[in-house]
Amino acid sequence: ANDNSKPRFWDVENFDLTYSYSKTEESDIDIEKYDKIVHSGAFGYTYNAEPKNIKPFEKVRFLNKKYLTFIKDFNFYYAPKTFTFRTTTDKNYTERLLRNKTEDAIIMKPSVSRLWNWNRTYTLKYDLATSLKFDYAATANSYIDEPSGLMTNQDFYKQQVWNSIKGLGRLNTFNQTFSLNWTVPISKLPLLKWVSMTAKYDGTFNWTASAASVQERLGNTIQNSGNMNLTTSFRLSRLYDNIPYVKNVVKSRGRGNTQQRQPQNKQANDTTSNKPKVNYGKIISDGAIKIIFGLKDINFSYQANNGTILPGFIPEPNN
């Protein structure tokens, strides 16, 4: 029963399919005929997996030592966590015929407009390891070219449309983004348990077509960008706990000063007794430690951004 409950990439629930059809007919004193036909369809696939985390060195005994923990904890996933694909299409056909409102026998010809959109979306989430995660997403928008005017030759129409579909349509825009997050295992080193570090890189790519009438002359426009972010946190309170003397000084609340003041009060009227020696060096050093080591946390962040835009680009991406 447990095996049957595991997600499979061929499970029926991973797929979805929709289709709709609508037709609008209108006419009035000015318009003899107005027909609008819309076909809409969508197909989607979503796979959510629970891949097993592989730890090849988990049972290696000599790696039990503290300074080898980062090797022992090495792990990876053999498959992506999530993959989705979705494609939608909208086919619009509009035919309009104006009414002849003159007394002359004027032949009125209908005007026809066609627009066939085709969108595709891809996403991928892959946890390469527990500390290394990769995300990717892409969207493509294209047009399926149809012969203009009324359909007079059905075979020619089908051939033109099928050739456009096989070429994934005439690409209009293509966008993709990816993100890589890494929790650096620096805290697994014994001397650096008090340090945590994360690194992240985000990248984008955009391709935009120019108008079809000037595309050969002006080309297309591409643009990309990259963002790198490095964040480091120093948990000094954890560091102090590893230094016993500093730990005691930081956590003390002036108890030592109270003990030193009590004998002075008892002997305030005794001018012949020897006054207790005051360790000014210790007082100064402890005070300095409290000031210096009173700082709990330090956070450091580094960020770098870059980008490029290039007009007049001729090639098209594979989408």
Set out the residue ranges of the language-model regions.
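Exposed, low-structure sequence patches enriched in small/polar residues
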Residues: A1-N319
